From Swiss-Prot:
It comes from the Eukaryota. InterPro entries: Mediator_Med10 (IPR019145). This is Mediator of RNA polymerase II transcription subunit 10. Keywords: Activator, Nucleus, Transcription, Transcription regulation. It is found in: Nucleus. It comes from Drosophila melanogaster.
Amino acid sequence: MSAPLENLETQLEMFIENVRQIRIIVSDFQPQGQNVLNQKINSLVTGLQEIDKLRSQVQDVYVPFEVFFDYIDQDKNPQLYTKDCVEKALAKNEEVKGKIEGLKKFKTNLLLELYKTFPNEMNNYRAYRKDSM
């Protein structure tokens, strides 16, 4: 992974950790924890600023809309998107492979039946096309 992406990943991990800590503080808020909460919120803002600075270094990264809508918004691991894409590609590959095999069998059967029905013409065809049978 390139350095800008590693920096972004590090900043995002720190941001997520800050949000997690803020959530813990807020869920059991006590007045004496106000200073810690303020520090965490300031750290969160600083983290967002750092992430914004890294934006220009990773502009060429394309993230499909489905990752946000179908995975992140649905509380799923975004890395499952890649797994699902590979599984869909494998399924489509198997489907196409089946069609190709079916067409090969059809070609073989068609040539055999044509040879039975039109032997002279098929001999001429075989002489013309060496790869036909």
